[in-house]
From Swiss-Prot:
InterPro entries: Rbsml_bL25/Gln-tRNA_synth_N (IPR020056), Ribosomal_bL25/Gln-tRNA_synth (IPR011035), Ribosomal_bL25_b-dom (IPR020057), Ribosomal_bL25_C (IPR037121), Ribosomal_bL25_long (IPR001021), Ribosomal_L25_dom (IPR029751), Ribosomal_uL5_bac-type (IPR020930)
Protein name per Swiss-Prot or TrEMBL: Large ribosomal subunit protein bL25A
Function (record text): This is one of the proteins that binds to the 5S RNA in the ribosome where it forms part of the central protuberance.
Family listed: Belongs to the bacterial ribosomal protein bL25 family. CTC subfamily.
Binding partners and assembly: Part of the 50S ribosomal subunit; part of the 5S rRNA/L5/L18/L25 subcomplex. Contacts the 5S rRNA. Binds to the 5S rRNA independently of L5 and L18.
Presence of keyword Transmembrane: no
Taxonomy, superkingdom: Bacteria
GO molecular function, one term: 5S rRNA binding
GO CC annotations, alphabetized: cytosolic large ribosomal subunit
Gene Ontology biological process terms from the UniProt entry: translation
Keywords, comma-separated and alphabetical: Ribonucleoprotein, Ribosomal protein, RNA-binding, rRNA-binding
Species the sequence originates in: Symbiobacterium thermophilum (strain DSM 24528 / JCM 14929 / IAM 14863 / T)
Gene transcribed to yield this protein: rplY1
Length: 205
């Protein structure tokens, strides 16, 4: 389980002009919603939100400390909107969760073993960066791992090869391609021959 992150928030006025003023003042307008929850328009500090997303991604349980409320709201980031030119976050949707109930959200795919595949003469082309999962908020993984260190032949690697931790269900179609391995110049045989030649060459006397 990931550590629960902390985020400051305050209620805000709605409307495009109010949102524009908030962004100029260093805040991101957003909303908290969820099953049985009255939607609440909020704003969060831009720097704090950007740092949280950059360091931890979107797949984390967050304690949103809304100004004036005694207890934090347990939320996850459901959607981020970014400026097409600056990539700065312009709006954020938070889903308020019950830690005892499962939720669906998107987390990144972490590929390991890519260097081994490249040493075998394979070119790795990434097709899918994130995957939708279902789990309890307390079991959200940082990422879903895909290990391709054992791939020796060209071809697609699909969602079926993802290693989901206990308590996490991957919702994507198992046949969806995550990445493709193709032969580089010289192919697998030449790369293996070069590797063997390199390992058999000892240090100069």
């Amino acid at each position: 389980m990931n550590a629960v992150l902390q985020l400051e928030a305050r209620t805000r006025e709605t409307g495009s002009r109010a949102s524009r003023r908030l962004r100029q003042a260093g805040f991101v307008p957003g909303i908290i919603y969820g099953p049985g929850v009255e939607p609440l328009a909020i704003s969060v500090p831009t720097i704090q939100l950007e740092r949280l997303v950059d360091r931890h991604g979107r797949g984390h349980l967050i304690n949103a400390h809304v100004e004036g409320e005694a207890n934090p709201r347990q939320v996850v980031i459901k959607q981020l909107q970014r400026d097409v030119l600056t990539a700065q976050v312009t709006h954020v949707d938070f889903l308020q969760v019950d830690i005892h109930r499962t939720i669906t959200l998107t987390v990144p795919i972490a590929v390991v073993g890519e260097e081994q595949a490249k040493r075998r003469g394979l070119i790795v082309t990434h097709e899918l960066a994130e995957v939708e999962i279902k789990c309890r908020p307390t079991e959200i993984p940082e990422a879903i791992t895909l290990d391709i260190s054992g791939v020796t032949e060209p071809g697609p690697v699909t969602v079926a090869s993802l290693a989901a931790p206990p308590g996490v269900e991957v919702l994507e179609d198992p046949d969806t391609v995550v990445l493709s391995c193709t032969l580089g110049f010289g192919g697998v045989e030449e790369a293996e021959a070069e590797a063997e030649a390199g390992s058999s060459t000892g240090p100069a006397a």
